[in-house]
Amino acid sequence: MNKKMLFVFNPKAGKGKIKTNLLDIVDIFNKGGYEVIIYSTQKPKDAYEKAKEYESKVDLIVCSGGDGTLDEVVTGVMEKKSSIPIGYIPAGNQACDRTT
């Protein structure tokens, strides 16, 4: 594994369901050749700060949570003027999380 990925998730989004799938998610990315750095948000702006901190240290950022988590990651990456790919696994309760 020579690729690195930051996985940021909101443990409270979607009634905490993401936690039951966490090992499966990490396993999928490991099989894809990624070393996964996992960060569970604890307070507002955590995802934003982690995205800014890691955008130059990883090859991919994936987040899971509601629209707020996604917004924080995208904003953090955009402020750094980075072109790093961002993935999103919806886990929130809002309707915008259920559309494609």
Feature annotation, model-predicted:
Residues 3-100:
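Small-residue-rich beta-alpha loop regions that form the catalytic core of phosphotransfer
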